[in-house]
Amino acid sequence: MITTLTCPRCRAETVWEGNPHRPFCSARCKTVDLAAWADEEYRIAGPEAPSDNDENDRE
């Protein structure tokens, strides 16, 4: 049985077995997704963390 998955970046169907880029369909989608994290396009839900400037303002 061949297991397929949907690439989280481009939504293309790809095969899981033997895919060195999984869960992505290609190295390009993997790199584009990494760049999106680096550019802070994705965020993890939760309260906003205080910035370094906030600590200096309290002194």
Swiss-Prot record:
InterPro entries: DNA_gyrase_inhibitor_YacG, Znf_NHR/GATA. Binds 1 zinc ion. The keyword Cytoplasm does not apply. Zn(2+) binds at C7, C10, C25, C29. GO terms for biological process: regulation of DNA-templated transcription. SUPFAM superfamilies: Glucocorticoid receptor-like (DNA-binding domain). Keywords: Metal-binding, Zinc. Disulfide bonds: none annotated. The keyword Metal-binding applies. Interacts with GyrB. Inhibits all the catalytic activities of DNA gyrase by preventing its interaction with DNA. Acts by binding directly to the C-terminal domain of GyrB, which probably disrupts DNA binding by the gyrase. This is DNA gyrase inhibitor YacG. It comes from Geobacter sulfurreducens (strain ATCC 51573 / DSM 12127 / PCA). The lineage of its organism: Bacteria, Pseudomonadati, Thermodesulfobacteriota, Desulfuromonadia, Geobacterales.
